[in-house]
Amino acid sequence: MAKAIPKISSRRNGRISSRKGARRIPKGVIHVQASFNNTIVTVTDVRGRVVSWSSAGTSGFKGTRRGTPFAAQTAAANAIRTVVDQGMQRAEVMIKGPGLGRDAALRAIRRSGILLTFVRDVTPMPHNGCRPPKKRRV
């Protein structure tokens, strides 16, 4: 006769207490990825675990309006609103990409009241790696 396996509480039950509202985060990293089509803002703690994120698409902008500076500003404000409530005071900012929303997102981050320790441009630059796609003829 097979023994009954004792039920161990599921992982989901253990995670509920440490969910978004419970953690206090004094310092974090704000990643801004600005492409020509969209801007994605991700807020992580210093270990790299995602705390909050937002993009121009999730902020209600669709189509070509996602690439605008105003959409990037709105996305940054939405991502930061939750972490300010969790007690974040200082942050590092990493900006990646050539998009129009770079400066607008940084302006929204500065306006949020979080003290910025540094702002770094982490756009990947090839040392003449892969051949780029052919130029568009419109």
Swiss-Prot record:
Region (Disordered), start-end ranges: 1-22
Annotated GO biological process: translation
Residue spans of biased composition, Basic residues class: 9-22
Disulfide links within the chain: none
GO CC, any one term: ribosome
Keyword Membrane assigned: no
Protein localization: Plastid, Chloroplast
Chief location: plastid
Domain of life, source organism: Eukaryota
InterPro entries for this protein: Ribosomal_uS11, Ribosomal_uS11_bac-type, Ribosomal_uS11_CS, Ribosomal_uS11_sf
Any one GO molecular-function label of the UniProt entry: rRNA binding
A Pfam short name: Ribosomal_S11
Keywords per UniProt: Chloroplast, Plastid, Ribonucleoprotein, Ribosomal protein, RNA-binding, rRNA-binding
Ribonucleoprotein listed as a keyword: yes
Protein family membership: Belongs to the universal ribosomal protein uS11 family.
Cross-referenced PANTHER family: 40S RIBOSOMAL PROTEIN S14/30S RIBOSOMAL PROTEIN S11
Subunit and partners: Part of the 30S ribosomal subunit.
Descriptive protein name: Small ribosomal subunit protein uS11c
Species this protein is from: Solanum lycopersicum
